[in-house]
Amino acid sequence: VSVNHALKHAASSIGKKITIDWIDSENINGNVDTLSKYNGILVPGGFGTRGSEGIIKTANFAREKNIPYLGICFGFQLAAVSFARNVCNHSDANSTEIESNTNNPIIDLLPEQDGVTDMGGSLRLGANDINVKPDTVANKIYGQNTISKRHRHRYEFNTKYLDEFAGKGMIFSGESDSGRRMEILEIPEHKFFVGVQFPPEFN
């Protein structure tokens, strides 16, 4: 509901009307071409294995067809997995939330979560500062070099793959204040391909 309201308010602010279709990602696997009629794709937060392959295919379709894409939280994570599979040629790339034995854990547990079994009490929660790199789409959107965003997640991008991703055309334009965690991804050569680890909401 909040995503619907945000999109409608954004459209209204620029004098546009918007039509929103909710699509079950479980139904995407063999029908990804049905997305070609859309002017933009937004993948909101989520978790688990259900529909994950459909999301990965959706992110790849948006990238290949130059369709604007915004991935939020899980949509950020699986956009990175999709890029690893289809651009970096790591065919088994995945999130360890989905496949714990993958040889290419693009998304992995936060270091402090390793061995934690109390899922509800182990999330990374609350507001955290994010440094936004200059001359990026993210910086143009926020208009500042530091932002504060709320978080709610246990998994994050594996920085082992940072240089490889950059060499293939995906950069991380926002990172935690410590520089340890990647918060915003984008493809500079794409019309608009952005993912954010945090929910982009008011504090």
Predicted regions and their residues:
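N-terminal beta1-alpha1 cap of cysteine-dependent amidohydrolase-like domains
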Residues: 1-146, 151-189, 197-203
